[in-house]
A protein has these predicted regions:
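Conserved SAM-binding loop of SAM-dependent methyltransferases across substrates and taxa
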Residues: 81-95
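N-terminal auxiliary segments of SAM/dcSAM-dependent transferases
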Residues: 1-47
């Protein structure tokens, strides 16, 4: 019988035999965290990642082939929220990797703490990404900075955190929400303005508009 799942061209991701769905190989088989669909094959468990709920998945579906994240990486995740995408990044980096999840909201941090009890490579930190001095003593240099923050100064937050924590040669992924920056300008104009700010500091290696999965969003991927 042919396999129902095969490696995706993006490292540590998988797809079904029709190439329509994205999966990660679970590091906590038997545990379901977000009512995600599960595919079991050859004693392995694969979790489906929904591009309408994850901007990382949306970027991959829209054609991003180098998201930079590898097994064993240390990740600084800004805007952790309830931990949906973090749970899949946790699969990607594996038990050898580590994720520092930053969020200022106590309610969502509670959910992230529950997630970290099962996924020990996730470290929840209640802090504001606008103020890295709140957590700079708790984290180390990282291989990846991933940011999903809906604030007007999201580009500046990303640049500051990359300057402080991202290792040379590391990758940054910035999810840009245009409407949080300006409600009057066209989204594409805002995307280009943010991209120019980022290009002044880092090498942009990919840029994807995330519609139809996420309206008024794009993903900018950089290398330091």
């Amino acid at each position: 019988m042919s396999s129902r799942i095969k490696p995706h061209k993006v490292f540590e991701l998988y797809q079904d035999d029709r190439g329509r769905r994205l999966y990660t190989k679970s590091i906590t088989p038997g545990k379901i965290f977000f009512a995600e669909k599960i595919l079991r094959e050859k004693k392995e468990e694969y979790r489906e990642i929904d591009p309408t709920h994850s901007k990382l998945a949306a970027a991959v579906v829209k054609g991003a082939t180098n998201i930079g994240i590898r097994k064993g990486d240390v990740v600084l995740y800004l805007g952790a929220s309830h931990g949906y995408t973090i749970s899949f990044v946790s699969d990607i980096v594996g038990k050898e990797g580590l994720i520092f999840g930053i969020d200022p909201a106590p309610r969502v941090m509670r959910d992230l703490v529950f997630l970290s009890q099962e996924r020990t490579n996730v470290v929840p930190i209640l802090a504001d990404a606008n103020h890295p001095e709140q957590y700079d003593h708790r984290i180390c240099g990282v291989d990846i900075v991933y940011q999903d923050i809906a604030q007007r100064n999201q580009a500046e937050i990303f640049i500051e955190n990359c300057n402080l924590f991202l290792k040379a040669g590391g990758y940054g992924l910035l999810s840009v929400k245009a409407r949080s920056i300006d409600v009057k300008k066209k989204s594409k104009q805002i995307f280009e303005e943010v991209r120019k700010k980022i290009e002044a500091k880092f090498t942009v290696i990919d840029y994807r508009i995330l519609e139809p999965f996420e309206k008024d969003h794009c993903m900018i991927i950089v290398k330091k």
